[in-house]
């Protein structure tokens, strides 16, 4: 765990393809346009998504990868690279708990190490009330991961959105979008 206070958020997903990169790029662009110094990061060794991040933020995005950076150096690296930022936005890799054996290098492991709150992106296409079980499962799977809310992606209609928001309320899961 970290002892520092530095504004940061992780945008994670239930799996690849749920819209993490699109959402993170939108957030980076928004904060940059509003005059905030936003520092992007990507969990893992990906070099494509950081290119999108850099375009939106106006400067480099960095990888947070405990395969390449020893875990005991990760906090030090994060602090150094985010020192001039008003907020850091970290895009997760694959699904929140996916990584190497025992979750090494997973987004969840990075979130716990950096003591970073997590916003979980849910793909709501072709699902209604059952999406609450998915969100609840992710929240309960590891209580050390601080899932602070969700972003609902690929909603089919206003009615669909209302249904999903209602069921998220039943499990006390904040919806950010």
Which stretches of residues belong to each language-model region?
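GTPase G-domain guanine-specificity segment
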Residues: 149-177
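ATP-dependent carboxylate-amine ligase catalytic core
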Residues: 2-18, 22, 28-114, 122-149, ...
């Amino acid at each position: 765990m970290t002892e520092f206070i530095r504004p940061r958020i992780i945008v994670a997903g239930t799996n690849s393809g749920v819209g993490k990169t699109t959402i993170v790029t939108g957030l980076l662009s928004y904060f940059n346009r509003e005059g905030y110094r936003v520092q992007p990061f990507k969990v893992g060794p990906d070099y494509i998504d950081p290119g999108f991040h850099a375009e939106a933020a106006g400067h480099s995005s960095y990888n947070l990868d405990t395969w390449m950076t020893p875990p005991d150096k990760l906090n030090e690296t994060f602090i150094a690279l985010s020192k001039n930022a008003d907020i850091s936005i970290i895009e997760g890799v694959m699904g929140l708990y996916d990584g190497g054996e025992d979750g090494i290098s997973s987004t969840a492991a990075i979130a716990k190490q950096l003591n970073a709150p997590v916003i979980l992106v849910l793909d709501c296409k072709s699902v209604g009330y059952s999406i609450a079980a998915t969100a609840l499962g992710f929240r309960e799977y590891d209580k050390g991961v601080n899932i602070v809310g969700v972003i609902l992606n690929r909603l089919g209609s206003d009615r669909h959105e209302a249904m999903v928001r209602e069921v998220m309320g039943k499990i006390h899961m904040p919806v950010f979008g």
